[in-house]
Amino acid sequence: MEVVYEDNHIIIVNKQSGEIVQGDKTGDRPLSDIVKDYLKDKYAKPGAVFLGVVHRLDRPVSGLVVFARTSKALSRLNKMFAEGEVHKTYWAIVKNTPKESEGTLTHWLVRNEKQNKSYAYTSEKPNAKKAILKYKVIGHSDNYCLLEVQLMTGRHHQIRCQLAAMGCPIKGDLKYGAPRSNPDGSISLMSRRVEFVHPVSKETIIAEAPLPHDPLWQSFKP
């Protein structure tokens, strides 16, 4: 586990693809438990350690996850995430290059619980939720394109679904149209950067995740 930022109220860690943020029906050990153990050992805390989960990343996605270390930070961060005051920047390696080098995508997403998949429509549908993101082309390799993505809304599989609807599926994302999987089971999407006002100290916090060790990711290193 890699800690990117830590203080008395929050801890930001770099999640690896394949890890789950919070416990689920698979029974796999979640990142939240790993962070709790880290805090317990580091500070020699007796008894249970408080750790609040304020947001999640899909299992095959890597990058920054923010946790709260106090109940005060948890309640304030929950409000900040809900009100769009936490600015998250994602990087995605995609097949195909968008027609426009930057733009805004607006779709209505319908979630299929049984398939654990979202479907994008260009107009309103029953039970659909409006999804908006901004993207920008920031790099190219021989066969792929690197996009920087900022979410204006937070929907189920939003980036994966909307980029696929644009004709640019994320590398390795079989569920949304990639031709083949990545060898390690990841998809080439990461939570690269997070910026927000600290819920207690009110300082501006900016954290950035290192790129995955995969050679393709490393080829995009600034």
Cite the ranges covered by each PLM segment.
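RNA pseudouridine synthases
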Residues: 1-222
